[in-house]
């Protein structure tokens, strides 16, 4: 289970012989009294409904006796085709009762996930677009096929998006707000920036793709894992009902401590046909300790600088699939105009945008997209980092 260990303090070990694991997140920032519960893979819809009815009764009984937690109860319900679960605010006794249900796989404390980008100076030269369509650094033009991602939908699972920004030309819509803050806008600027790189007319790679904003992080750039999982679930269902998951891309320029729940949700999205681009993280350390970057089925992206070196902040290691421009990237700013940001958060949308572009151009989908990106890329990155299996920088093959 990697960094996980059994809780041995206040929650105690569940005495039932077949009790589910109650995982601990010793190196993560946890949300007080908030948990994610994952059911076993063979849980039927009837089993899940029965468990929810039982949970409501049990939770009500426990809270009535103690009344120690405010606003408690289920918050999100997850229902992928092969993964069921939920999250909520529960007291310790309820968590121990949940773990005793033989249909529960594990219980995981909810943790804080954050963006992988930071604002730097404004008005620096833009270079990322030119770099991904030319074999050498220093070019000044972006060469691309006129199909430009048409027919593909990109899901920005982020801080929200200014869908009215002129660079989106009306191709961006608001989808879902899992933060539940009543603020359907991008108060951070992070999500608008990453989205501009993916689909913007001026700043973007897939200039004809559509974009759906899925807000899972607040205006401070952080949010609970439970909301991220809910955002993934919502995106998969929306894609399934609107053109199909095989014509959908998801970008996740975010991450936090290793989470089985988050990795399983990301894997479910890939299994159902979506392509997922994930930021490796900005801690100059092994990305294997971060989620969702450590999930093997996603395309995990490290950041490169303008001279084709690995960005000094970029994570590295066996989880890395590709590198993409991430230092000093110019893209859209909420309210209009542009700004510069750096981070693996800026690298991942280059991959997501190029994925949408290739899906429209070549008709590929899902896991085949990451493989195709590796084929088209150039072996350009210097100092890819310890244990990193690739030095490939993405390229569109010169259109």
UniProtKB/Swiss-Prot annotation:
Residues 175-198, 282-312 are annotated as: Disordered. It is found in: Secreted. It is an enzyme of class 3 (hydrolase). Residues 34-115 form the Inhibitor I9 domain. Glycans are attached at residue 251. PANTHER family: ALKALINE PROTEASE 1-RELATED, PEPTIDASE S8. This is Subtilisin-like protease 1. The gene is SUB1.
